[in-house]
Amino acid sequence: MSTVTWGKKRKRSGGDSKAKSRGSSSYIPRSVSSRRESLQVATFSWTSSGSGIKFSPGGAAYLVSNFPQGANDNCRHTNKTVLYKFMAKNTIYLDSSHYMKVFRAPFHFWLVYDKSPGANVPSTGDIFEGPSLFPHNPWTWTVSRAACHRFVVKKTWSCVVESNGIDPTKGQGATYYGPGPCNQVKSCNKFFKRLGVSTEWKNSATGDVGDIKEGALYIVGAPSQKSDVYVNGYFRVYFKSVGNQ
């Protein structure tokens, strides 16, 4: 019976071991990752008292990129800001004059970028083609051809409020068999990222639209169905100060 003989282990030469040691000890330098600077935060409410603001047919626009000059977190530190994120936590409710009606009223929002803002916040008629002809149908509005090089709609969303003919502030008797509750009050929350709205500022201390050299952001709201609607709550923006001081 023949025996199986296994091959002998090959002895490594000194050159092989040195080459392996050189390969194992090779160092690949890595770049040092710098920590990204935190975004600044500014929070706004619709009114200083916390009450709701009334929107009537035709709608209205309000400045979002409102950053006065200063050292606080909600202020601009340089002559340029970039707005990245937007959060809205709002409550929408009908004016009490519409409680006796039976209808549904969609409410529309837009985030609109203005490349060349003026001394005042523009009206919806300055931005859109439609408010004069269709003031009660804001879903038909679009940026006018004459202003398309100035205004850009970044985001849009809507929320529906309703009325069932019953005043919700009054109690009903034991024999009431009318309609049930409806969305006379509706919450409407939104969060948008990657907006990238760049704003260049004049050498001034305040943060109004007249202080902006280029690039403003507005929130625009408009009710439908000949209704008057209140919007209550707040919105928050996340931005960064860039450029020179």
Curated annotation (Swiss-Prot):
Report whether Metal-binding shows up as a keyword of the record.
Answer: no
User: Where mainly located?
Assistant: virion
Keywords (A to Z) from UniProt: Capsid protein, DNA-binding, Host nucleus, T=1 icosahedral capsid protein, Viral penetration into host nucleus, Virion, Virus entry into host cell
Q: Can you cite a GO biological process for this protein?
A: viral penetration into host nucleus
Compositional bias (Low complexity): 22-31
One cellular component term from this protein's GO annotations in UniProt: host cell nucleus
The record, for Pfam families, names: Gemini_coat
Q: Name one GO molecular function term.
A: DNA binding
Q: Which domain of life does the UniProt lineage start with?
A: Viruses
What function is annotated for this protein? Encapsidates the viral genome into characteristic twinned ('geminate') particles. Binds the genomic viral ssDNA and shuttles it into and out of the cell nucleus. Plays a role in protection of the genome from degradation, virus acquisition and transmission by insect vectors, infectivity, and systemic movement. The CP of monopartite geminiviruses is absolutely essential for virus movement.
Name the family.
Answer: Belongs to the geminiviridae capsid protein family.
Q: How does it assemble?
A: Homomultimer. Interacts with the movement protein. Binds to single-stranded and double-stranded viral DNA.
Q: State the protein's name.
A: Capsid protein
Q: Which organism is it from?
A: Bean yellow dwarf virus
